[in-house]
């Protein structure tokens, strides 16, 4: 699992994603083991990062579902969820606060 996370982070980093964060949710009441959030430089870069992930992770990874928009892409690998967001969407939706509360065992806290 750690190798998979490292490969995802490396792919995002090598392709100029910003503020990459990994949340370990294995012991929490969440539907995936890990969540990864990364910022893109803009809409075109968001799609480019998705293309790089597809190129670098296939055929090892099965992309169960991909929700695409220029501002926010969610990649579901089954046990890992990857969020690629423009800085504006990342600020607006503040997924870090939600995922940090889960990772720190505060599942019931309101955000």
Region roles according to the model:
Residues 74-102:
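C-terminal structural segments of small proteins and small subunits
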Residues 37, 72-74:
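Conserved hydrophobic/aromatic beta-strand scaffold that supports enzyme active sites
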Residues 29-31, 68-70, 77:
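Short Gly/Ser/Thr- and Asp/Glu-enriched loop/turn motifs at secondary-structure junctions
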Residues 61-72:
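Short, conserved loop-to-beta-strand elements that form functional interface hotspots
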Residues 1-38, 42-57, 61-62, 104-111:
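Ribosome large-subunit tunnel/peptidyl-transferase-proximal elements
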């Amino acid at each position: 699992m750690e190798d998979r996370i490292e490969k995802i982070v490396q792919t995002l980093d090598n392709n100029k994603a910003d503020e990459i964060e990994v949340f370990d949710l294995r012991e929490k009441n969440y539907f995936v083991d890990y969540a990864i959030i990364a910022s893109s430089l803009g809409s075109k870069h968001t799609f480019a990062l998705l293309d790089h992930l597809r190129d670098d992770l296939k055929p090892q990874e099965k992309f169960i579902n991909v929700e695409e928009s220029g501002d926010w892409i969610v990649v579901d690998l089954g046990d890992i969820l990857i969020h690629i967001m423009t800085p504006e969407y990342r600020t607006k939706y503040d997924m870090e606060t939600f995922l940090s509360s889960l990772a720190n065992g505060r599942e019931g806290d309101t955000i």
